[in-house]
Amino acid sequence: MTIESTNSFVVPSDTELIDVTPLGSTKLFQPIKVGNNVLPQRIAYVPTTRFRASKDHIPSDLQLNYYNARSQYPGTLIITEATFASERGGIDLHVPGIYNDAQAKSWKKINEAIHGNGSFSSVQLWYLGRVANAKDLKDSGLPLIAPSAVYWDENSEKLAKEAGNELRALTEEEIDHIVEVEYPNAAKHALEAGFDYVEIHGAHGYLLDQFLNLASNKRTDKYGCGSIENRARLLLRVVDKLIEVVGANRLALRLSPWASFQGMEIEGEEIHSYILQQLQQRADNGQQLAYISLVEPRVTGIYDVSLKDQQGRSNEFAYKIWKGNFIRAGNYTYDAPEFKTLINDLKNDRTIIGFSRFFTSNPDLVEKLKLGKPLNYYNREEFYKYYNYGYNSYDESEKQVIGKPLA
């Protein structure tokens, strides 16, 4: 199979440019140890959902070219797009999974390209919960499940009722199955696929975050009752189980303390401090995670947050609790070309900076940041399409090209 060159990606001539001051002499380009690996610089591509897998959730040739291009700068940490941990976890078309052999074999080809470029990979395990597509689940004989039967908005309730697949609360037996079977199965396939790290998606209003959040968790059992310990129980059970499967030094977690995306209420420091305390206790006993990824208060899901609404919100509290590595991500280009916030947030030796949207339009983002070359502004209109246009190419003919399974 032919892998396209990075140089084949040419954006439209009217694309807006963002000026960049060279960052090659900053801490961004100093090494950092993450688990058992030493990354030569501190830039990560954090997950961007793009819908370019095959319709049956197998990674495609389009994704192979995409991740190969974005891992060309040696030592880049590529955290692949949110990836379904099980069929029950989500069934949206063209979203990749990591729960069967064909998916693992396809991801392995992508990882071989990433590793061949001298870079590193992490897979983000995704479980949708109440924000899943009720009709698609119904068509596959699967339920729409969540911590509690609380819809995230009126439209999602309407669609679920029309599909005849109304939202219901998970039973404790189903929760046990998620912890003991579904997540471990995905993690084992991730190891078979050659991923360096496995990241648990605990952010942005998806299932694990739904348990954390009072807006979505109305349970009256050991996973609810309003208490922090109960609401965090499922997340920490998943962490502990996957430590057994992949090892703590290959495991990671993503959190979004300040997000109000998909019907969530901002939980802020309290419950996230508890989670970090629990993870630090595990680290003190020799089970330190590879990294914790934090979403900055500048963004909530796919939306930017106004400066006014960011006031009083910061992820600095996390450094006082967790002593391991952090990835921090969320609109770090807002103060370009100087990148003063980025430089300030690198003041310690435990931080990696994540970029997402600008990686979509700049396969060579790492080199551009190092040398101070202008960045192409991203085109969100093409983020969630199935074809190759706006993904690996801007040739109009690529609107007819859909990804083919790699295995």
From Swiss-Prot:
InterPro entries: Aldolase_TIM, OxRdtase_FMN_N, Oye-like. It comes from the Eukaryota. Disruption phenotype: Decreases phagocytosis of the fungus by host cells. Increases expression of GPD2. FMN binds at residues 49, 124, 254, 357. It comes from Candida albicans (strain SC5314 / ATCC MYA-2876) (Yeast). GO terms for cellular component: cell surface; fungal-type vacuole; hyphal cell wall. It catalyses: A + NADPH + H(+) = AH2 + NADP(+). Signal peptide: none annotated. The active site is at 206 (proton donor). Keywords: Flavoprotein, FMN, NADP, Oxidoreductase. GO terms for molecular function: estrogen binding; FMN binding; hormone binding; NADPH dehydrogenase activity; steroid binding. Belongs to the NADH:flavin oxidoreductase/NADH oxidase family. This is Probable NADPH dehydrogenase. Its cofactor is FMN. Its EC number is 1.6.99.1. Pfam families: Oxidored_FMN. Oxidoreductase that binds mammalian estrogens with high affinity. Induction: Induced by estrogen (17beta-estradiol). GO terms for biological process: steroid metabolic process.
